[in-house]
Design a protein with these regions (language model features):
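Conserved catalytic/acceptor-binding region of the Class I
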Residues: 5-71, 81-94
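C-terminal lobe and adjacent flexible extensions of AdoMet/dcAdoMet transferase-like proteins
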Residues: 72-157
Length: 157
């Protein structure tokens, strides 16, 4: 809210929770550690915008599916995009050949004629910035922000 002028338009896109669900599922068969970062769902994004005081939010989603010849090709593209696992709870050691082979075998169950699918859920949102001093909402209630300089000092005396 500090960077956007009052009644300015906020536009953004991000990934949704269905992004790379096939990869997440495949690695879940091979390893208990998470391998795909989680993303906020469309309702959570809308709620966050409203709670931050933005008005008239519009949130939409679409899915795009790309296909790869094999799991290493997908992993190579993810690394090239910089989309590696950023989770703190991720495994810090190498995945290892046996785990990677188990994930690859599990991923093969999703194979289509075009190759291994990778789903990308794209969530797009827009909302209008609130007026200066508009309340921030949390848990359905307005939070009041009062600058310290505006708090009167009562002196005993």
């Amino acid at each position: 809210r500090r960077a956007l002028k009052p009644q300015g338009l906020l536009l953004f896109s991000t990934f949704g929770p269905e992004t790379l669900w096939e990869l997440r599922s495949a690695f879940a068969h091979a390893d208990a550690a998470p391998h795909v970062s989680p993303f906020v769902d469309i309702a959570g994004i809308g709620d966050a915008l409203v709670n931050a005081g933005f008005f008239q939010p519009v949130v939409d989603r679409e899915e795009e599916v790309t296909h790869y010849p094999n799991l290493p090709a997908l992993m190579h593209e993810l690394r090239a995009l910089g989309a590696t696992n950023a989770l703190r709870s991720r495994r810090t050691t190498l995945t290892g050949r046996s785990r990677f082979a188990a994930a690859s075998t599990a991923y093969e169950t999703h194979r289509a004629a075009a190759g291994l699918p990778a789903t990308w859920e794209i969530v797009s949102a827009m909302a209008w910035a609130p007026e200066p001093g508009a309340p921030i909402r949390e848990g359905g209630a307005d939070l009041v922000a009062v600058p310290v300089s505006k708090i009167p000092i009562r002196r005993r005396g």
